Amino acid sequence: SSLKTAFKDMFWDEKKGYLADFCDDQSKDWSFRPNQIFATALKYSVCDKEMSKSILESSKNKLLTSRGLKTLSEDDEKFIGSYIGDQKTRDHSYHQGIVWPWLLGHFAQGYVNIFRDNALPLLEEIYNEFNSEIADYGVGSIGEIYDAEPPFAAKGTIAQAWSISELIRIK
């Protein structure tokens, strides 16, 4: 369709194999972020199967951790892996690498859309990674965000509804 063609022309780079994070008339931001997984998770996606597969595999390799998806790839000079410091410093790091568990639901939906039954082993692994966190840290819940580097310490709100709800959706 013309919408899919326009979207692909605007956001896709065949060589990079992923979507631009932001586009305007003058430039494109090629920071590798999880925002593109939403396009793969839609029932009527603007991405074709090969685009979605490339986005998901790249996201798995560059963003997926045992606690969620990083908000920015480590190979980006803007990457900040720890949520520490004063309020201004922490606020700045929030979208620069910090891990958000709630993004896992959309990642999982995209993975199922493309890989169908072959997605199940990865999704079970993702879910099972949280067993001790659910039992010990949040007593039935999980944190809002996590550091992007081992040991992936929980930060922010100790029991975040959108984080646990997306994990339940995976289950």
Question: Where are the language model's segments positioned?
Answer:
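Well-ordered alpha-helical scaffold segments within catalytic/enzyme domains
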Residues: F38-K49, G105-D117, E166-K171
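The feature captures the short pre-catalytic strand/loop hairpin that immediately precedes
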Residues: G81-R90
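Catalytic cores of carbohydrate-active enzymes
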Residues: S1-S82, E125, S132-I164
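Extended amphipathic alpha-helical segments enriched in small hydrophobics
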Residues: S1-K4, I98-I134
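Short, contiguous acidic/charged loop-to-helix segments that flank catalytic cores in large enzymes
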Residues: S27, R90-V99, V112-N118, A154-A159
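Bulky hydrophobic/aromatic packing residues
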Residues: M10, W100-L104, W162, K171
